[in-house]
Amino acid sequence: MGQIEWAMWANEQALASGLILITGGIVATAGQFTQWYLGAYSIAAGVLVCLLEYPRGKRSKGSTMERCGQKYLTRVVKLFGPLTRNYYIRAFLHLGLAVPAGFLLATILGTACLAIASGIYLLAAIRGEQWSPIEPKPKERPQIGGTIKQPPSNPPPRPPAEARKKPSEEAAGVPTGGPQENPMPVNDEVV
């Protein structure tokens, strides 16, 4: 069996955590909780986490499915260089963003999810993984001479391949697919 790429799981967990933080922050702010400012903080932290985590990283083996519109955010994430590429930094950033939101009931679920994502990122960093962008593959242009095949010699409709006569069978005296002669006499008497 192959190695588990932990960063892929951490990315999904952190993105979901960001969305949960935003939702909890909206509930806390709109509900005018006692510490509503922590709800506003959770909205900002959730947006930051979502922007950081939306671009998927390239897998070391196999292919990676790019998210819709990811290429635009990938450029932004690439600008920060080692700050976003290193999973140790991401793990501690997520853990630091999660702590203040943990003091409010509406955002505690997002805090727990983000703390779990932080732990998974720490595991990925210990295993030596790092974020690398998904680069678009250059499209290979088909060579013009290589794709043209011999045109068919029979006009349509053509018989199936197994029904076509082969020149070697015809020369060998193999009977063709014409009518056969019945060795038994047939009477057409109707009673």
From Swiss-Prot:
Intramembrane segments: 70-80
Any Pfam family matching the protein: Cytochrom_B558a
Membrane topology note: Multi-pass membrane protein
Keyword Disulfide bond: no
Highest taxon in the source lineage: Eukaryota
Modified residues (Phosphoserine): 168
Disulphide-bridged cysteine pairs: none
Cellular localization per UniProt: Cell membrane
Cytoplasmic side of membrane: 2-7, 54-69, 81-86, 127-191
Chain segments annotated as transmembrane: 8-30, 36-53, 87-104, 106-126
Ranges per topology, Extracellular: 31-35, 105
Molecular-function annotations in GO: electron transfer activity; heme binding; metal ion binding; protein heterodimerization activity; SH3 domain binding; superoxide-generating NAD(P)H oxidase activity
Keyword terms, alphabetized: Cell membrane, Electron transport, Heme, Iron, Isopeptide bond, Membrane, Metal-binding, NADP, Oxidoreductase, Phosphoprotein, Transmembrane, Transmembrane helix, Transport, Ubl conjugation
Cross-link annotation Glycyl lysine isopeptide (Lys-Gly) (interchain with G-Cter in ubiquitin), location: 149
Disordered: region residues: 134-191
Keyword Oxidoreductase: yes
Its biological purpose: Subunit of NADPH oxidase complexes that is required for the NADPH oxidase activity that generates, in various cell types, superoxide from molecular oxygen utilizing NADPH as an electron donor. Subunit of the phagocyte NADPH oxidase complex that mediates the transfer of electrons from cytosolic NADPH to O2 to produce the superoxide anion (O2(-)). In the activated complex, electrons are first transferred from NADPH to flavin adenine dinucleotide (FAD) and subsequently transferred via two heme molecules to molecular oxygen, producing superoxide through an outer-sphere reaction.
Assembly and binders: Component of the phagocyte NADPH oxidase core complex/cytochrome b558 complex, composed of CYBB (heavy chain (beta)) and CYBA (light chain (alpha)). Component of the phagocyte NADPH oxidase complex composed of an obligatory core heterodimer formed by the membrane proteins CYBA and CYBB and the cytosolic regulatory subunits NCF1/p47-phox, NCF2/p67-phox, NCF4/p40-phox and the small GTPase RAC1 or RAC2. Interacts with NCF1 (via SH3 domain). Interacts with SH3PXD2A. Interacts with DUOX1, DUOX2 and TPO. Interacts with NOX4; this interaction mediates superoxide generation.
Family: Belongs to the p22phox family.
Protein name in UniProt: Cytochrome b-245 light chain
